[in-house]
Amino acid sequence: QPQQIHVHSASVDAPGWLNVATPNFYRLHETTDFSSDHAFLVGTPIQIGHHPRRRRLVLNILVDALPWEIVGSCFAEMMPQTARFFARGLIFNQQFSVSEYTYPSLATIETGLYPHHSKMFHDKIPVELSSSIATLSEHARDNGYATAQLMGFGAGLYDGCMRGYDRLIAAMYRSPAYEGTERIIRHLDGMPDADHFIYFHTADAHPWTAPLFQQETAV
């Protein structure tokens, strides 16, 4: 059953509801009091707004298991639409991963550190990222961006690599690009006046040896 709350501000004095199965987001334009007969948790407020010195959208896309040393030689042939898009930007051909393994590579993307400095090198050896190390998403949030990871697995929730994101949607197994793209469109439509820093981790190219047992999250 949803939890009833009461919302009070200078312009609103009415009951409301909390969905107990998912985080609830309320957009506030003025000082607002929330009250309820039952306990509820309040997260860190998300700053929303545009500044001319910020980009409207910074979109960080990680296509897991897409090897450039293979795709690079036939990029325009195999991925024509992607090739046309990046023809107007920069392609770094001398960019190398710190590991042929996703877990430590994600930590490097977020921190800029080698695994022997971040201590993130194996998901079966739990190490929390030092609080003295600022992540890429924390820098973005400190500079006024609304930060979100709308598709990606949740390992970074426990080791601290994803601690700078205001909103996270974790999918540990199935993460198709079409579903993540829809989430991004809905997210941008919901906050058109914000400056966004969005991380999008898709695994369409990643080989899976196990059967696809997971239901689509959109269902």
Residue ranges, per PLM feature:
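Catalytic domains that recognize anionic headgroups
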Residues: Q1-V219
